[in-house]
Every structure is written in structure tokens, then in C-alpha cells.
Amino acid sequence: MKTINTVVAAMALSTLSFGVFAAEPVTASQAQNMNKIGVVSADGASTLDALEAKLAEKAAAAGASGYSITSATNNNKLSGTAVIYK
């Protein structure tokens, strides 16, 4: 029983820690207080929400804590870019 409780606790804590590393959208005023660390791009999204999710995922993978979407275009599938910040 103790092993099960330990495993459940470890799973719960690991789930919570993933949220800490997620990149969040930032406003222009918030971005002024952050360091720009690059730009990410994504394509092939069918909705704006899906495009934002792809850009957020790439920003997090690059170690960013925030991102600001700078472009979105539609040519059958959506593509876009975002500046990433730390």
C-alpha cells in the first residue's frame, strides 16, 4: 500500500511540474521586462488555437517562459511565427 501511495504521489508531482515549464503568452508591456531569446515558427495548423498550441509547444521546448505571436497566415493550413522570451 505504501508503494502505491508513493507512486501516486510521484505521478501527481510530475504532472504539476510540467505546468511550470510551459511557455505562456505575453503582452507587449510584459515583453519589455523580458529577454528575447529567439523566434519559433509552426505550420500545418487547421485552427488558430491549434497554431497557438504549436507555437507554445515550440517555445517551451526552446526553454522560453513566454512568447508573443507576430504573424499568422492562411494558405489552406495556418502557419505563424512568435518571438520567444525568457
Swiss-Prot record:
Disulfide bonds: none annotated. GO terms for biological process: DNA damage response; response to stress. GO terms for cellular component: periplasmic space. It is found in: Periplasm. Residues 1-22 form the signal peptide. Gene3D superfamilies: Flavin-binding protein dodecin. Belongs to the BhsA/McbA family. This is Uncharacterized protein YbiJ. It comes from Escherichia coli (strain K12).
